[in-house]
Regions:
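RNase H-like (RuvC/DEDD) metal-dependent nuclease/polynucleotide-processing core
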Residues: 1-233
Length: 233
């Protein structure tokens, strides 16, 4: 799991990777412990937006799609979140179940799912779903390949490319991992929401809602390059 905090200082975007072992988390992730750690860290940093790369909810039976949520169709995600317990491919099931549970735990701790687009610009705290591949595309950059397909030096090359586009400084830039860079690029949407003018923000999907004891649908929030017409206030 890659974690990265972002803030703005005098127009500069400052990013700092955070290693989970330093926060006391080791071994196989557990949703309750991870949610508690994320919330504690966010409160220490004074953050109000937390981005999670993973599905926040299951498919609505009435969305007109066979296998996926609306946001997944719009962004062409490789994994599809179907009705509760059903995923495509089936090997994604443990990850998706974990992600939905993580969002549930975050909501219990006071960090709910985003209810609508207007709420994004309020002063409220939210746990937001991200999709780093779409974040790269939204910035008109080629996505970072999957970890297994990323050649040596590619993470540093992509970080340099991102730094040429936006005013970013990264603590320990030479040691940034694949997952941390993915967390960084996804988190740029939060920087845009908080008023940084270097990029905008877009939402895919529809508002989340509860049905038969489980959450369905939801928004995926991504950064967007302002000079392409893709950015939305």
């Amino acid at each position: 799991i890659g974690v990265c905090s972002l803030r703005t200082v005098s127009g500069q975007i400052e990013a700092a990777p955070i290693r989970l072992p330093a926060l006391g988390l080791t071994g196989r992730p557990e949703a309750t412990a991870l949610a508690t750690t994320i919330v504690d860290l966010a409160e220490q940093l004074g953050a109000r937006l937390v981005f999670i790369d993973g599905p926040q909810a299951w498919k609505s039976p009435e969305n007109g799609l066979v296998h996926s949520r609306i946001c997944e169709r719009q962004l062409a995600t490789p994994g599809k979140t179907g009705l509760p317990g059903i995923t495509k491919p089936s090997t994604y099931a443990p990850f998706i179940v974990f992600a939905v549970e993580l969002f549930d735990q975050l909501a219990t701790l006071g960090w709910p799912r985003l209810p609508d687009a207007l709420a994004l610009h309020s002063a409220s705290r939210f746990a937001l779903e991200s999709f780093p591949t779409a974040a790269w595309r939204g910035l008109d950059l080629a996505p970072l390949p999957g970890k297994a397909k990323t050649p040596a030096g590619a993470v540093q090359a992509k970080l340099a490319e991102l730094s040429r586009l936006l005013p970013i400084s990264v603590e320990g830039a030479g040691d940034v991992t694949h997952d941390e860079l993915q967390a960084l690029v996804a988190g740029l949407a939060g920087i845009a929401v908080e008023g940084h003018t270097s990029c905008g923000v877009t939402l895919a999907g529809v508002a989340p809602f509860e049905l038969e004891g489980t959450w369905r649908e939801g928004f995926i929030v991504n950064p967007a390059r302002r000079n392409t017409g893709k950015a939305a206030e």
